[in-house]
Amino acid sequence: QSLWYHYDFASAPVKLSVLAMNLGQEGGDAETRESDTQYMQTVGTYVQFTPASWNLSGSFYYQTGKNVSARKVSAFMGSVRASYSINDSWTVNVGTDYLSGSKKSDATYRAFNPLYGTHHKFYGTMDYFYASDFVNGYAPGLSDTQIGVGYKVSSSVSMGLNYHYFATGVKLESLNRTLGSELDYQLDWKIMKDVSLSVGYSLMRGTSTMDVVKGGNHKSWQDWGWVSLNVNPTLFKK
């Protein structure tokens, strides 16, 4: 069950959203073949403030209840972002996201679960985090600090470059918290009405901590490039 409320303030450039969600997940005992349902609740808010050339936003969400393994949950996430339009062409932005993590020794599960979030939109376009699971029983959370710049070449062409610094949300055993850095570049071209082209390239430089919690070999070259042709026709119009 979900409850969502959104309000646009008439007297100020402020938008406010509130979310409350109750999620039931079925689990059980493989030996007795008995099933049960564990319930976890997520509550939080998102606020956006857009005075003049600024775009400021922040969010906070808290999770409680029990996860599918029947462990008590107490987790949270927070996000703060700011962007500024220097002129009609240039934009700069900074931001930070923090998702709490859990140690293996924790009796209470403290790793925040983004659930149905649009993972590709956040935490870098290479999708190292949350679009794929952590390994070896780790749930370290995530800290993502980013800075970027956008440039509008013309009315139909724009590009952006963003840098991400990733770290675990909690300190794990003898591991360093730093996971690595990612650089994302994207160019968007509106070719004609209903047709656009997007091109991107990303580069990740990981650490030995990344190898432990995500697998792989951080010493190998890690990058990807992509091209997307988007066709969005209007089929029905009054």
Regions found by a protein language model. Give the residues of each.
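Outer-membrane beta-barrel translocator domains and adjoining extracellular loop/strand segments
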Residues: G27-Q38, V68-M77, K104-N113, V170-T178, ...
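Residues on the lipid-exposed face of transmembrane beta-strands in outer-membrane beta-barrel proteins
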Residues: L3-Y7, T45-F49, V80-Y84, V94, ...
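Repeated loop/turn-to-beta-strand initiation elements of outer-membrane beta-barrel proteins
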Residues: S11-V18, S53-S57, S89-V92, S155-L161, ...
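Extracellular/periplasmic loop regions
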Residues: N55, S59, Q63, V68-K152, ...
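Transmembrane beta-strands of outer-membrane beta-barrel pores
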Residues: F9, A20-E26, P51-S53, F60-K66, ...
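Internal metal/ion-chelating core segments
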Residues: Q1-G58
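Outer-membrane beta-barrel "beta-signal"
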Residues: S220-K238
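Residues that define the transmembrane beta-barrel architecture of outer-membrane proteins
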Residues: Q1, T37-V43, A52, K72-G78, ...
